[in-house]
Amino acid sequence: MIEEGLLLPMNVLLQGQKLTLLDPEMWFLRGNENKDVTLVITIGNNHQKLMVVEDILLLIDRSQIEVTAGKVIYHPLRIDILSKLLAFIDESTGSVEREHHELFADALPFASEVVLFSKVASEAWFLATYLSSDNINEILFQHLRKTECYKLVRYLLSQSLIQTSLYDLGELYGVSYSHFRRLCSYALGGKVKTELCGWRVARAVLEIIEGNSDMTTIAHKYGYSSSSHFSAEVKSR
């Protein structure tokens, strides 16, 4: 059940233990399990103290975490799922990456633990959160925009109309071909070429529905040899 949603297996940090995060992470902590906990989160010479008084989503940047009191019981969350979804939303609205605020850890009150057990439920919760007018949610969106997954999906979407190889995409992104494939597999949650082909089909179908041009013209625009080739691709999905 855990493996189907955002919630990953429980971890524990004891008093005095330290943990170094190399990438932004998101944790779920239950207030009743972490009543006497104090965390100190450090980046360089900057320190931030955090105490847990309720169920929270803990958003942590690249940093070192030290437990100075109590025992931390937490579940890491699959940040890639929400980062990918936000990347699609931002791409569709033409949003540009905003400046990040100065804090490198934030605790957001979270009373919807049940949604974390299902990918569908968590995505529905996230979309509802995005559409709400509560400004505090912008902290979550800013955090997700810091992730490699978000940046990679935005990059792939920006390049999706260009007929180019994964090798060339990786080179332009600034990493080796093998590392680029690994990054893409994690960010997309599946086979890279299959996912990119799916995006191409979806964009082409959307243009046809919107009536922007005829099928043959759109098929050629998206790299299909003919309208028959495009139709066959759509039917295969």
Predicted regions, residues:
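Terminal helix-turn-helix DNA-binding modules in bacterial transcription factors
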Residues: Y186-S226, S231
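Solvent-exposed, amphipathic alpha-helical segments
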Residues: L103-F110, E148-Q159, R203, E207-G211
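Short, Lys/Arg-enriched, Trp-marked, Pro/Gly-tolerant hinge/linker segments that flank
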Residues: S112-S176, Y186-G198
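Key DNA-contact positions within bacterial/archaeal DNA-binding proteins
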Residues: S178, R182, S227-S228
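Short, contiguous, well-ordered secondary-structure segments
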Residues: A107, L166-D168, I218-A219
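Short, contiguous hydrophobic alpha-helices characteristic of membrane insertion segments
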Residues: E233-S236
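Amphipathic alpha-helical segments enriched in hydrophobic/aromatic residues interleaved with Lys/Arg
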Residues: H75-Y130, N137, L152-R154
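N-terminal regulatory/effector-sensing and dimerization cores
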Residues: M1-R98
